[in-house]
Design a protein with these regions (language model features):
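C-terminal charged capping/lid subdomain of soluble metabolic enzymes
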Residues: 185, 192-253
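Active-site segments that bind and position negatively charged phosphate/pyrophosphate groups
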Residues: 82-211
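A glycine/threonine-rich phosphate-anchoring loop and its flanking beta-alpha core
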Residues: 2-92, 183, 187
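Short glycine/serine/threonine-biased micro-segments
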Residues: 19-21, 69, 135, 160, ...
Length: 253
């Protein structure tokens, strides 16, 4: 992420939300892509929070289905990046997070089936705003591992950010699942997916990860890089850049 301290003056920002996804209507983040150099870098400043945001769910009625699904994956990824954290005493924040995840799981399929369902669009829009406005991550350590990885995918290839996140997220979850992290995945399984308690914690954790992947797939998101015609050509460059830009100081492993 580029040095945010250099952003000392910002013109007043007003947003009109046309997609529930990034949370720009209520957050301080920005991402800039430079396709000729394959760079996609983020930055942030509290000065960049919009002064006013117009959030009318009816503006989302005409979104293509893939953008509705990808936007939901982006919202969920924002929550995951802060929910899966080494910080263990943030009960309120985690309950916020679980509620937002349940909202996405409930309302994305409804919006896909009935694009003009006001309730579904309104709840997804509100989830977008709440996922990255600071509440879920307040007081928590987080590495934001998936976003730097996906930023490299969409820096080198013309893919939708949320699609890349949906592909990366379940694989990241399986990679980090360990004795140190399994209890959090058990919480996720029980509190978000309403799965019954099992004696085998790892079996329950993997069921929750499988449910996450299936949800994205059922929403119509391609779930492999092959489907997007992405091969291993740039993987080494991507990996180096992801670590350089994202860092591993608070990685949840």
């Amino acid at each position: 992420m580029k040095e945010p301290s250099k952003i000392d003056k910002v013109l007043p920002i007003v947003t009109v939300l046309t997609m529930a996804a990034t949370g720009s209507e209520m957050d301080q983040f920005a991402v800039i892509s430079k396709m000729d150099t394959n760079e996609k870098l983020g930055t942030s400043s509290w000065n960049m929070i919009p002064k006013t945001s117009i959030c009318d769910p009816e503006y989302l009625y005409t979104l293509p289905s893939i953008q509705t699904a990808a936007g939901t994956a982006d919202i969920m990824s924002h929550v995951f990046e802060e929910y899966f954290s080494k910080t263990t005493d943030a009960f309120v924040q985690d309950k916020f997070a679980e509620g937002l995840l349940q909202t996405c799981i409930k309302y994305c399929p409804i919006a896909l089936k009935d694009p003009e369902n006001y309730e579904a669009r309104a709840n997804l829009m509100w989830a977008s705003s709440m996922a990255l406005n600071g509440l879920c991550g307040s007081g928590k350590e987080g590495a934001w591992s998936c976003h730097p990885i996906e930023h490299e995918l969409s820096a080198f290839y013309d893919i939708t950010h949320g699609v890349g996140l949906a592909i990366v997220t379940p694989r990241w979850m399986r990679y980090i699942l360990s004795e140190n992290t399994v209890d959090k995945f058990v919480e996720y399984a029980i509190n978000v997916w309403h799965m019954p308690v099992k004696e085998d914690k790892f079996a329950l954790a993997n069921e929750a990860i499988d449910a996450t992947e299936k949800f994205f797939k059922d929403c119509g998101i391609p779930m492999t890089l092959e489907e997007l015609n992405i091969d291993e050509t740039y993987f080494d460059n991507m990996a180096k850049a992801a670590v350089s830009h994202g860092g591993l100081a608070y990685a949840y492993v």
